Amino acid sequence: MLKEHLDPRKPSGTGYTSKVRVRDKYHIVGFISSGTYGRVYKALGKNGQKGEFAIKKFKPDKEGEIIQYTGLSQSAIREMALCSELDHANVVQLEEIILEDKAIFMVFEYTEHDLLQIIHHHTQPHRHAIPAPMVRSILFQLLNGLLYLHTSWVLHRDLKPANILVTSSGAIRIGDLGLARLFYKPLNSLFSGDKVVVTIWYRAPELLMGSRHYTPAVDLWAVGCIFAELLSLRPIFKGEEAKMDSKKTVPFQRNQMMKIIEIMGLPTKDIWPGIVSMPEYSQLQSLAMSRAPGHFPRSSNLEGWYQSCLKNGGYATSSGAGTPGADGYDLLSRLLEYDPTKRITAQEALEHPYFKNGGPISANCFEGFEGKYPHRRVTQDDNDIRSGSLPGTKRSGLPDDSLMGRASKRLKE
């Protein structure tokens, strides 16, 4: 429930007075990014409130040139509700929500980096691998936060590098809970109301196959994709998304499924018994028959991809602190398991030899790293948080919800 600040000098029950406004508490430094939800600004605390903050302003629904105050989107409500309740060092947490002039502002601690930004940095001006200890720390913290979400009965449903935030002290925060959803005893299948979840490159095969009763395993597949991308500096399954038609029918993502099959092999009922009952199984069969015999590998080529990745990245192919090694491949293969019932869980992943055998894991993923990552771009253009225009497009290279970070409001576990 959203609460405006009441004047303590006025008895309760007599109405709202002396509301705290965003600019009363925060100095707006500049504009960061925008998206379909609205805009994000960087701010500093005022009146003794120390720290840097990211303020996310939701835009009202608009019809033509007339603004219609018809309420908040389902995504915004979910994000506010969940962020207000969750409490974990590796999950985004909310500082406060401010209601001002029919606009909603979510205030978060400012985070300086995200994984998309870090990966991009390692491709410029030439490709240079992310250090193996950093990858290990990032993955451990990510799985630690994900375990908390899953034990709290929350599916994230949109894990991708842009939504994995990193503080200047190297702490990982899982951000953007706009698609997150509770999954215990659902009244309806999780498919209802949300026909498309998870950005296409990180979408689990059961989602591509039309599953309506998916599980936390969808998040673990996305973690596998992120792990692979940290090592290779490019998305492992970079397909092209087929858009919905005019009837809002969700199409079979043929190209994305092809990208997965090219590395993981053609899924069969022997390795994934439940696939034969999937709504899109006939489409998969059609895809397989549309290619010449032998076009798609019958078995996984993930290990070959992994070894090539280590070689190209300059990682040692043996074991040791300077390489993900054989343990890294084993964990990756368990994360990228076709059958969601066999896919490794967050708890199991945290206990995997990849983390157990490589020595201590730093809570600061930057520990030992001598380089520096660039700061976020903050502009003075259109930085009026109250009257700023609200375009529906986002800044190039600055993903939606890329600034979510840790905050102080807590609910004890």
From Swiss-Prot:
Needed cofactors: Mg(2+)
Primary site of residence: nucleus
Alphabetical UniProt keywords: Activator, ATP-binding, Kinase, Magnesium, Metal-binding, Nucleotide-binding, Nucleus, Repressor, Serine/threonine-protein kinase, Transcription, Transcription regulation, Transferase
Biased composition (Basic and acidic residues): 376-385
Top-level taxonomic group: Eukaryota
SMART domains, sorted: S_TKc
Region Disordered, annotated ranges: 376-413
Protein role: Component of the srb8-11 complex. The srb8-11 complex is a regulatory module of the Mediator complex which is itself involved in regulation of basal and activated RNA polymerase II-dependent transcription. The srb8-11 complex may be involved in the transcriptional repression of a subset of genes regulated by Mediator. It may inhibit the association of the Mediator complex with RNA polymerase II to form the holoenzyme complex. The srb8-11 complex phosphorylates the C-terminal domain (CTD) of the largest subunit of RNA polymerase II.
Name assigned to this protein: Serine/threonine-protein kinase SSN3
Species annotation: Aspergillus oryzae (strain ATCC 42149 / RIB 40) (Yellow koji mold)
Upper taxonomic lineage: Eukaryota, Fungi, Dikarya, Ascomycota, Pezizomycotina
Gene that produces this protein: ssn3
